[in-house]
A protein has these predicted regions:
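N-terminal Rossmann-fold NAD(P) dinucleotide-binding loop
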Residues: 148-149
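Phosphate-binding beta-alpha-beta segment of Rossmann-like dinucleotide-binding domains, i.e.
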Residues: 80-138, 302-303
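Rossmann-like adenosine-cofactor binding region
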Residues: 43-45, 167-260, 275
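A conserved regulatory-domain signal marking ACT and ACT-like small-molecule sensing domains
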Residues: 301, 305-386
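Glycine-rich Rossmann-fold phosphate-binding loop(s) that bind the pyrophosphate
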Residues: 144-145
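An N-terminal-biased, well-structured beta-alpha scaffold segment characteristic
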Residues: 1-79, 192, 212-214, 218, ...
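Oxidoreductase and adenylate-handling cofactor-binding alpha/beta cores
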Residues: 88-107, 153-160, 285-299, 334-338, ...
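Rossmann-like dinucleotide-binding domain for NAD(H)/NADP(H)
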Residues: 213, 221-313, 357, 368, ...
Length: 386
């Protein structure tokens, strides 16, 4: 039986995917085999020796020490796309709300309490909140992953002209994207075309300040920008300067900061993107399934620090080896399996940056002695026999 520790409140719908005959889910345990986490800060957490995996019920993993996990042979999973619909719906809602000045208009209405001539005041005051329909306008989508592709498709259905930029678009995302979305190979070519720009890329050193002085200079005057991905993707100083000059007429974001709160034309929401029970359920279910499949079968799906390896079992025992991505590893591993007289039914080896994963299905004397010999190979970090 595997022990699973939960560091946050995890949806019962997800926990139900962990069969109680194979998994013991507990909040208080010092030696878990797996951890389910949402937002708890694990950066300074000391990991027990038998910890095999951490599954994050969400996409971002900046609360998990990835490098240290890799060094200790701990597989880290996330749940890309599980909250995509929740975020996409909010983006479309804010796109419309921002275009029609809904937030500032609703706030103005709160001051009408007790006005004896409210109807006249409303008719007179509504002119200051004049907005625009989005039908026929142009939307630029930066990043066409699970969320960006949904936003693009929905905008097409609402009558917008949509351009998309994503040099790393996956095959699955491309298949799911409407044929009416126009693909741009260069971000600088897309920006001048757009009345609205929405960002849906992960936060990486290469994506920090995607919206900056240079990119803003290329945009249409009066462009509206939506950021429901990561706050750091937009350079705040450049944004505020562009709003003062009228280059940017509106900024809608899920990431409030002291610098932008209270500024005209800026609407902040308190990180509501994935805050729906449906999204929490979806994330928990995906995280639990990933964790279960790895612990029981050694399959790695949606890991952020290890290569993806997903194979049906071919019979016999399964040998799972996490090791450094170095030359000669396969020959060292197979030399030991040959010495042990094993017949390899199936073998997969994949790498991700400096990490690699080798998985073998074999028949014969797969025992503790073999595991110890495999673990003694200098570049091997962890060996499991399932």
């Amino acid at each position: 039986m595997y022990t699973i520790k939960t560091l946050n409140a995890i949806s019962p719908v997800g926990l139900a995917k962990l069969n109680n005959k194979q998994f013991d889910v507990a909040v208080d345990t010092d030696a878990p085999d797996g951890i389910l986490v949402r937002s708890a800060d694990m950066l300074n957490t000391a990991f027990n020796d038998n910890l095999l995996a951490i599954a994050r019920a969400g996409a971002g993993v900046n609360n998990i020490p990835l490098e240290r996990c890799s060094e200790q042979g701990i597989v880290v999973f996330n749940t890309p796309g599980a909250n995509a619909n929740a975020v996409a719906e909010l983006v479309i809602g804010m796109l419309i709300a921002g275009s029609r000045n809904v937030a500032v208009a609703a706030q103005w209405c709160q001051g009408l309490t007790g006005d004896p001539a409210m109807a006249k005041t409303v008719e007179k005051g509504k002119k200051q909140f004049l907005g625009y329909e989005i039908k026929g306008k142009t939307l630029g989508v930066i990043g066409l992953g699970a969320i960006g592709s949904r936003v693009a498709n929905c905008a097409i259905e609402l009558g917008m002209e949509v351009y998309g930029y994503d040099p790393y678009i996956s095959i699955d995302a491309a298949w799911n994207l409407s044929s009416q979305v126009r693909h741009c190979v260069n971000l600088n070519d897309m920006l001048p075309l757009c009345d609205y720009i929405t960002i849906h890329v992960p936060y990486l050193p290469t994506t920090k300040d995607t919206i900056n002085v240079q990119t803003l200079a290329l945009c249409k005057d009066g462009v509206k920008i939506l950021n429901y991905a990561r706050g750091e993707l937009v350079n705040t100083e450049a944004l505020l300067e562009a709003m003062e000059t009228g280059k940017v007429s509106g900024y809608m974001t899920d990431f409030p900061s002291e610098a932008i709160l209270g500024k005209p034309g800026i609407v902040c929401t308190p990180h509501l993107g994935a805050s729906t029970p449906e999204a929490e359920d979806n994330c928990a279910v995906m995280a639990a399934k990933e964790l279960s499949d790895y612990l029981k079968n050694g399959n790695i799906i949606h890991s952020v620090n290890m290569p993806e390896v997903n194979q049906p079992r071919a019979g016999g025992k399964r040998i799972c080896i996490i090791h450094k991505n170095e030359p000669g590893m396969i020959s060292q591993i197979t030399a030991l399996t040959t010495e042990a007289g094993l017949n390899i039914e199936n073998m997969v080896n994949k790498s991700k940056k400096n990490m690699a994963y080798t998985m073998l299905d074999a028949t014969g004397a797969v025992d503790k002695k073999l595991a110890e010999k495999l673990a003694a190979i200098p570049a091997v970090i962890r060996v499991r026999i399932l």
